[in-house]
Amino acid sequence: MSYEEISRLADLIRSYLKQYGYDIDEAPYTANRILCIAPHPDDCEVGAGGLLAKASDHGTETYMLVLTDGSMGTSRPGISRDELALRRRREQEEAAKVLGVKKVYWLGYRDGFLPYTDEARLRIATIIRRVKPDLVLAPDPWMMYEAHPDHRRAGLLVSEAFLYSGFPLYGPETGDPWSPRYIAYYYTGRPNVYVDITGYLEKKLEALKKHESQLEGLEPLLKLLVVYAEQAGKKIGVKYAEPLKILPRILVHAIPLAEII
């Protein structure tokens, strides 16, 4: 199909979804609860810190789930993994406070070794059922050139847990089923929604600066994030934005239309 044909089809799919109560453009603004799931401490801030700050400021309950302990995130050989894990946990809790996040959940897997297992998926689904979010955030596991296995596995595990958490016969011992309406992928190369974070970029950067153990390599990233937010903002005519790939639950299984919208 030509670009014009794909664009028309995407508009048609969005219109169809709206008829059934799914408005992906409004998903970040209409959620009562948002759960941001991160492979490591600081990923939610980098990928969606502006959205989390804005949502919290507007009365949305925001939560984080960090899958690993962050114990490999250093270039300094003198620090132990246990010491670094404790430090990064403290930093994450402080950063979450800056963004207005109500609670940070931890699974505690070893950084660099996030397992792609049924057990990990069930643990994520358990938190989804506990928090009952309308919108779940996760790294896009299909982003090209993503070299970190924790990011790829996290995205896949969250996608599966997002789908499975609504099935009553899946892990019934973990609680009542809950079906979030949308999953939003950050770190994505194929965004379909740009969230206006004008007025909240400074809060995002403030939260990131709480990750002091990462500051050695963070300064260039902070500058890059500003440029990235500026470029994303131009897509919707605002100063700063965060790009996301947002999908409703009905498009995450056996329907290739998710690639188009």
Which residues does each PLM region occupy?
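Active-site rim/loop-helix segments in enzyme catalytic domains that contact anionic ligands
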Residues: 1-131
